[in-house]
A protein has these predicted regions:
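Bacterial Sec-exported substrate-binding components of ABC uptake systems
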Residues: 3-5, 12-48, 158-196, 305-310
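Short helix-initiation/N-cap motifs at beta->coil->alpha
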Residues: 24-26, 81-92, 112, 134, ...
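Alpha-helical, coiled-coil/dimerization segments enriched in small aliphatic residues
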Residues: 67, 205-232
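Structured C-terminal subdomain patch of bacterial secreted/periplasmic proteins
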Residues: 143-154, 158, 247-310
Length: 310
């Protein structure tokens, strides 16, 4: 696993001339200067801030410990920053902290029609940049791809006046991914893959607009829910059984462990004929690997190895 704060990224970079404008979903947002009181929501978005070396511009983060997603590496990265809210922050929390920038997404700290949105915060001069993967909740967008991650890192680099730092990081990710994939043995056919996030009565999974679709495809597989016109959402078990996935990716977070999720599927007679269950082909991704963020490259490597396992 690569460190959250690579040494090369904490070095100084030339200052960027302001104002700058970036696209955030269906909006264009202009910044007259780099934010100085930024707040990020969720572990993956916060790691994007950390990997770009932006902690000096932050006053805190939200939405991590409420879902038990803070690992040792992440805890060290945010050691000097307060968690302003264990789950989604209220408008009052952000205002009370003196926030001038909120990095969040739809269902990553904001809800469509909720009290915390770009419009409600904009009235108090709090700028918002929305996670690209989540834009499907407010506009039409292409299916998920690795470009979603790269776009967010480059936009953050522009917003905070470190575009060269972001460009170097993204170029490194591209090169690492290309080199890794070039070394992989070809697959005869793309394995059918189902993402099991949570839920027993009905599974919460990744559709065509969620990052795991991009990770699975980069690793050589195909998401059996690729025709599901959603990002992260609930489906029926009948659809999973009918799709007959050959590999099941378990997203590990929260109170139910990955092993408990695997046991639920292995011990349920209704799933006995699913190929992945029959052959015990499960692979675990941590939440921070399965959602858009710096650990996506490691996630592709994990999936690629699992897809080629005997």
């Amino acid at each position: 696993m690569r460190p959250i704060l690579p040494a090369l990224l904490v070095l100084g970079t030339p200052a960027l001339a302001y104002p700058v404008t970036v696209r955030s979903c269906d909006r264009e947002v202009t910044f007259e200067a780099a934010p100085e009181a930024a707040v990020s929501n969720d572990v993956n978005l916060t790691e994007m801030m950390l990997v770009l070396g932006l902690t000096d511009h932050m006053i805190g983060y939200t939405g991590i410990s409420g879902w038990n997603k803070l690992d040792a590496e992440m805890r060290a990265g945010v050691d000097e920053l307060p968690e302003l809210s264990e789950k989604y922050p209220s408008k009052e929390v952000l205002l009370g902290a003196g926030t001038d920038f909120f990095f969040a997404g739809w269902n990553y700290g904001m809800k469509v029609g909720g009290e915390v949105t770009p419009e409600t915060l904009g009235a108090f001069d709090i700028a918002v940049y929305e996670l690209t993967e989540s834009c499907t909740h407010v506009m039409d967008k292409p299916k998920a791809s690795m470009e979603d991650l790269y776009a967010d890192l480059l936009a953050l680099g522009t917003i905070f006046g470190v575009p060269e730092r972001a460009e170097e990081l993204v170029a490194g990710y591209r090169a690492e991914l290309d080199a890794m994939l070039a070394d992989l043995a070809p697959l005869e056919t793309a394995p059918r893959v189902f993402v099991y996030d949570s839920g027993e009565d009905s599974p919460f999974t990744a559709g065509r607009y969620a990052m795991p679709t991009a990770l699975i495809e980069a690793a050589g597989g195909t998401n059996v829910m690729d025709d599901f016109e959603k990002s992260w959402a609930t489906v029926g078990w009948e659809a999973v059984i009918e799709a007959d996935p050959e590999v099941i990716v378990i997203v590990n977070y929260g109170d139910v462990t990955a092993e408990q999720k695997r046991a639920f599927m292995m011990e349920n007679p209704a799933f006995a004929d699913i190929s992945a269950v029959e052959n015990d082909r499960f692979v675990t991704l941590e939440y921070v690997e399965a959602t858009p963020g710096p650990r996506n490259i490691d996630a592709v490597a994990t999936l690629a190895e699992a897809f080629r396992a005997e």
